[in-house]
Amino acid sequence: MVKHVIRRRLRSERGAELIELAIVLPILLLVVAGIVDFALAMQRFLTLNNAAREGARIAVLPGYTQTDVQNRVTQYVREGTGDDTASPTTVVTAVTIDPAGPTPAFPAAQVTVTLTHSYLFLGPVSGLFGGGSFSSITLTARSTMRIES
């Protein structure tokens, strides 16, 4: 009788669902966080592309300087990311305009605006998993427009 009760308890699967949930839930949460973080990186990349295009559009207009373009690009990135408190050095690390002047020497010149931004995957959480080469990527956006006279 006692032997039969012990065998029945050993074969019982009570609590197995909780153990399976404890094993699967962290993996599932990490996958969902990765999907959300990838979507945020794509949103940041699209914002940088739009900001580069806006900067190039401003740069081809007469009377605008490189500082004007940098200010507009930084404003666009801040509005696009919703981070109004971010400083320009953390939002846009480089704005390159080629040629670097308000008006080029010849009328058919092209203006290229290049933006770079370092995106940290999973934010500060990536350091918990050892970081590595996939903890951050450099997003680069470039837009070229021809100056019409």
Give the positions of each predicted feature.
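Short, conserved structural patches
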Residues: V2-K3, E54-S149
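Alpha-helical assembly-interface signal, strongest on the long, hydrophobic N-terminal helix that forms
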Residues: V2-Q75
